[in-house]
């Protein structure tokens, strides 16, 4: 996530990137995770999927736009993974994105779903443990 502040003729940017524990049916691993509210969905690099979870083929290939004008990336697989923030168990779907520059990215949909707050001043993540409690009504 990039948060910018204008100072004179330059911008100051803040990034939050933390190691998170990811857990799948095949194992678990800490991945350095970028929190990016500019990314719609959460993503994971293909190199880290094999030992975590079996990827599921998407019904239709998704073509994601990149920052390069006119450039797209084809995404064919998705995985569902559990992950921990401050010892709070959360879960979501991650697109398996070839050529991803990060190990994992938590996007806006996941941030909103779990009401994750980003504290740039203290470089920390805030998640209410109550959001992870399952309720059956």
Where are these regions (language model features)?
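Short helix/loop capping segments that flank catalytic or ligand/cofactor-binding pockets
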Residues: 43, 114, 135-136
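Short, Lys/Arg-enriched N-terminal segments with co-localized hydrophobic residues
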Residues: 1-12
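Hydrophobic residues embedded in beta-strands of well-ordered beta-sheets
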Residues: 42, 123-125
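Aspartyl protease catalytic core from the pepsin/retropepsin fold
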Residues: 12-39, 70-120
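A generic "binding-loop/recognition-motif" signal
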Residues: 39-40, 48
């Amino acid at each position: 996530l990039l948060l910018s502040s204008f100072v004179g003729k330059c911008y100051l940017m803040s990034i939050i990137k933390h190691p998170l524990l990811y857990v799948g049916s095949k194992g678990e691993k800490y991945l350095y995770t970028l929190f990016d509210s500019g990314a719609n969905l959460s993503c994971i690099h293909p190199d880290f999927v094999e030992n975590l979870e079996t990827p599921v083929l998407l019904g239709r290939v998704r073509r994601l736009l990149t920052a390069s004008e006119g450039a797209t990336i084809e995404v064919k697989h998705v995985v569902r993974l559990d992950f921990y923030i401050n010892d709070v168990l959360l879960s979501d779907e991650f697109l398996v994105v070839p050529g991803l520059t990060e190990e994992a990215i938590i996007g806006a949909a996941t941030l909103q779903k779990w009401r994750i707050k980003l504290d740039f001043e203290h470089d920390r993540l805030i998640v209410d443990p109550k959001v992870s409690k399952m309720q059956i009504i």
